[in-house]
Curated annotation (Swiss-Prot):
Transmembrane segments: none annotated. S-adenosyl-L-methionine binds at residues 224, 300-302, 305, 330-331, 382, 411. GO terms for biological process: cobalamin biosynthetic process; methylation; siroheme biosynthetic process. Keywords: Cobalamin biosynthesis, Lyase, Methyltransferase, Multifunctional enzyme, NAD, Oxidoreductase, Phosphoprotein, Porphyrin biosynthesis, S-adenosyl-L-methionine, Transferase. It comes from the Bacteria. This is Siroheme synthase.
């Protein structure tokens, strides 16, 4: 972040605005709404400022700027139409370590004013850091249509009731859950929208007697990597969580969307390297839920497709813990789509099979005869370290050596890299790849040249030469 968003209390604080035109008027309006003690310095004044001065809403000084005007001031805004004057004001204010904003010149300002959606006491601020003010304005206009006017009343009445809630619910996480439940069902907002304040207060009171001490677990699929592929429900639960247990494949960009105060616990697993044993993960889910916490078990892709989700839920059922499951976009769907490879196609594949290259025990055998059948697409999760076995078994069971193969590395992310070759060279294709890699085997891979649409930031989308992969 170039700027840290901070809401500052300006009530009765002395503020100076230099400039008396329309731009200055807009800044002064905001300062007055926040209760600031405003002095305006200019050689000429907009008529509205003269009227406000006559009404004792602000003070005006009909003079040029001098550095003495900065004495005892807390905040300064330079809004003249003269660049040299504005720069002089900024330099003088910086020397006195005052907060200063120069309109239209973020580079010499110590703070900037965001676009604002005002539903006081609820206020939303949007800023592009001065880089795209029109974009920030358009976002504000969009939010204005989404946030109803009665949100201010909702926040105000909640503030009046906070002390009562603290008296009844002593534990902070349970208080948060009370408010989430109250705000989440929409009943309170509907009553206030209709002006039924007494009924709204009654609802808040009766809701205090409901049992909110029981924790629960949400098994959430985080998708294949791109944060924008998260479902709305997944994001909602991540924002409500007390504890999040996440896997190795969940990216930092997705973890950044979790509620700031939530505890983040890595229970990541890689083949042959279990950071936390599965049994311990199951135990933690039960323990945290019994403590009354809202627990999110965050897994890459979809929890029910090679994600051990079923094993974890069986443990919760035995312990009597309430749970819900939120599906995610599985790697096969996400990575194939971003690589331009349809998993089925009437001309090439009438079926698709998902298998994992990381099985529970080494002795488990796949039905290689069925997997080697033509006119189907085979998708292998976590198959990179088993490339030699997969190649050998498919070839020995009759799959053609020239069968197209794609390896989608770090799919759907800005680091996505797709390597395409033939089944006969599968072992060599993955030689230079590290990180999560999905294997797609079948004639549909030939469509990637035509249908590939996603150009990642860091690498070319397609490579057909293993040597190039090793150089990447």
């Amino acid at each position: 972040m170039d700027y840290l968003p901070i809401f500052t209390k300006l009530e009765n604080r002395p503020c100076l605005v230099v400039g008396g035109g329309s731009i200055a008027c807009r800044k002064i309006h905001l300062l007055l709404k926040a209760g600031a003690d405003v002095t305006v310095c200019a050689l000429e004044f907009n008529p509205s400022l003269l009227k406000q001065a006559a009404n004792k809403e602000l003070k005006i000084l009909e003079q040029a700027f001098t550095e003495e005007l900065l004495e005892n001031k807390w905040l300064v805004i330079a809004a003249t139409n003269k660049k040299q004057v504005n720069e002089h004001i900024a330099t003088a204010a910086h020397a006195k370590q005052l907060l200063v904003n120069v309109v239209g010149q973020a580079d010499i300002s110590s703070f900037i004013l965001p676009s604002i959606v005002d539903r006081s006491p609820l206020v939303v601020a949007i800023s592009s850091g001065g880089k795209a003010p029109v974009l920030a304005r358009l976002i504000r206009e969009r939010l204005e249509t989404l946030l109803p006017m009665h949100l201010g009343r909702l926040a105000a009445i909640s503030a009046q009731f906070r002390h009562r809630v603290k008296e009844v619910i002593k534990v902070a996480p349970l208080r948060r859950r009370y408010w989430e439940k109250l705000f989440g069902n929409g009943m309170l907002a509907n009553l206030l929208q209709k002006g039924q304040t007494e009924k709204a207060i009654a609802l808040m009171e009766t809701s205090l007697s409901e049992d909110i001490t029981q924790g629960d677990v949400a098994l959430v699929g985080a998708g294949p990597g791109d944060p924008s592929l998260l479902t709305l429900k997944a994001l909602q639960l991540m924002q409500q969580a007390d504890v999040v247990l996440y896997d190795r494949l969940v990216s930092s960009d997705i973890l950044d969307l979790v509620r700031r105060d939530a505890d983040l616990i890595s229970v990541g697993k890689a083949a042959g390297n279990h950071e936390v044993e599965q049994s311990r993960t199951n135990q933690m889910l039960v323990e945290f839920a019994r403590e009354g916490k809202k627990v999110v078990r965050l897994k890459g892709g979809d929890s029910f497709i090679f994600g051990r989700g079923g094993e974890e839920l069986e443990e919760l059922v035995e312990a009597g813990i309430a749970f819900q499951v939120v599906p995610g976009i599985t790697a096969a769907s996400g990575c194939s789509a971003y690589a331009g490879i349809p998993l089925t196609h009437r001309d090439f594949a009438q079926s698709v099979t998902f298998v994992t290259g990381h099985r529970k025990t080494d002795g488990e055998e796949l039905n290689w005869q069925a997997l080697a059948a033509p006119n189907q697409t085979l998708v292998v999760y976590m198959g990179l370290i088993q490339s030699q076995e997969i190649q050998t078994q498919l070839l020995s069971h009759g799959r053609a050596p020239e069968t197209p193969v794609a390896l989608v590395n770090k799919g759907t992310t800005s680091d996505q890299h797709v390597v395409i070759g033939q089944l006969s060279e599968l072992e060599q294709l993955g030689g230079g790849l590290q990180g999560p890699t999905l294997m797609i085997i079948g004639e549909v891979v030939n469509l990637a040249d035509k249908l590939a649409w996603y150009q990642s930031d860091n690498k070319p989308p397609l490579s057909r030469d293993p040597f190039l992969v090793n150089l990447a």
